[in-house]
Amino acid sequence: MLQRCGMGFGMVGLAGLLADEGRLAAQESDSAPDPSAPKRSHFQGRAKHVVHLFMNGGPSQVDTFDPKPKLDEYHGKPLPSSNLRTERKTGAAMRSPFQFAKYGQSGIEVSELFAKTASHIDDIAVIRSMHAEVPNHEPSLMLMNCGDGRQPRPSFGAWVNYGLGTENRNLPGFIVMCPGGYPIVATQNWRSSFLPGACQGTYLDSNHTDIDKLIANIRNTKLTLEEQRRQLDLVKKLNELHAEERQHAPLLEARIQSFELAYRMQSEAAEAFDLNREPQHIRDLYGSGTHGRQLLITRRLIERGVRFIQIWSGAGQPWDNHDGLQTQHLKLATDWDGPIAAFLTDLKQRGLFDETLILWGGEFGRTPVAELPGLSGRDHNHYGFSCWLAGGGVKGGVVHGATDEFGFQAVENPVHVHDLHATMLHLLGFDHERLTYRYAGRDFRLTDVSGKIVREVIA
């Protein structure tokens, strides 16, 4: 089934082209023309591309972008009010082991963990009043990625792919990179659900440096391109006959398109992912680490018209530091900080920054109090956390919203995940209430029945 294409480039490969055509069930309706074709947004958007830097596991806001001096005063003591209920038992206040400093003309305070990123703070809008719904990874990941933590819904990238189409038909419009395997709930994070299957994310394991492994199985080495073309034309005719008999079958249509995409990718994919084509000084700028490679690939994909690129910190939930937070956050942030700064610099130098909307953050934050019994980590915190936006029409050098004096709960200008999505869609040129898809008798949208634009972060 086409939904399995979200498993990676290999799942859109040509090697097994004829193996399972007869298994495709005609169970959907409302087929449409090529869903990847370029489309106009509701109005002129500021951004053409989205890059989502996902710190999966939940980074601590009070150790990164939300300084709380009160935690120093109360370190090792109970908070004046009772701790909010989270997933696990928590105890006394826990100060940040990291120093904050003011950066840029805006003077926004950022932790030393992201000192290099903070050199761009005048181009960044920090939202310190994010909030979600529950302190659990799975529903919070679904909410951040799909706009609903309970029901299967299309991912944000799928909505963008559906709404705008792709600028390059030789590459997927939505690419997901996660080094070392899948994050929690795996391909559900980038699914298309009831949207056309061609809109879903295409996954690759960015731990691989060998191109043939990174984008495996898009070639059938047993056939020439001409033979593949003839085979593909035959399969397309058979699929079209199958579709005619059943009137409407969007998954089948998407499957046809996925075969076509795999064929076209043979001419461009290897070149797009080949970092040896970059000059040495650019490779040095990004560094040799995994996140540097991912972000350099991302810049190359943006140049080639890919709409939505999502980059994960790693398999599982790397930022989920219930203990050993100081050591783990330091390692994780160090791996990200330099490459993020390099990426922002590179985009600006190439004139891509203003058309690329960048989101940094996790599915939730962490408590300002220590988790019991270890006292060296923090529990999940959905009541108040931070993210930041940059590029693509974002007003830089601003802080929006605030948590309480300890960083536990959003208290000033709270921003729900639906509000974040509405704002990002607006920057892409969409009225979030009008970007809908009819399914099961009702119109669905990414922001469900809520969401308001955070205009304070828009330039």
Model-based region annotation:
Residues 1-459:
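Ligand-binding pockets and gating/stacking loops
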